[in-house]
Amino acid sequence: FLKFNASIKKETPTILTLVKHFKNQGYTTISNNKITHLKRDIKEWDEEWYPYEKGWRNYQSKENIRLEKKGQHGYAYENPDIDDAAYYDGKTANKSIVDLKKLKAEGKPFFLAVGFVKPHLPFNAPKKYWDLYKESEITLPKNTSFSNSAPEIANHSWGELRYYKDIPKKGQV
């Protein structure tokens, strides 16, 4: 696929998906969270689950939620002191553990696909994970120039990142 938003069904309508192959072999198939970029692009799952109760950015801080409700981008990251399950990836992990136990008890073959959204902008995670690293001990690379030997397609202007409130619209990131 050449674009991030390509549809499996539209681009390759006759392809036998991995999910369909497993179903054809008698497997129970479960999809938890983001497996393909487009939600519900593969129709063959026995069960397809998404934790999205509100916007996909899954902000938890009051300021970011307020900005998003106004149609604005919030900050590129947040680190509130909250439980893992407040974020979608925590919910996904918990649901997948429950599914694994259930599937094991059933004793039949299964294919469980588990998709985590992170690392993806915005870089939101509970404070305890940010506390594992001291910002002062993280060394940035000395050379941030674009390599002449790299393909042009690799060069970009940080477009997605620049949408966020705390990132400059131009210049160094």
What is each PLM-predicted segment?
Residues 1-173:
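Formylglycine-dependent sulfatase
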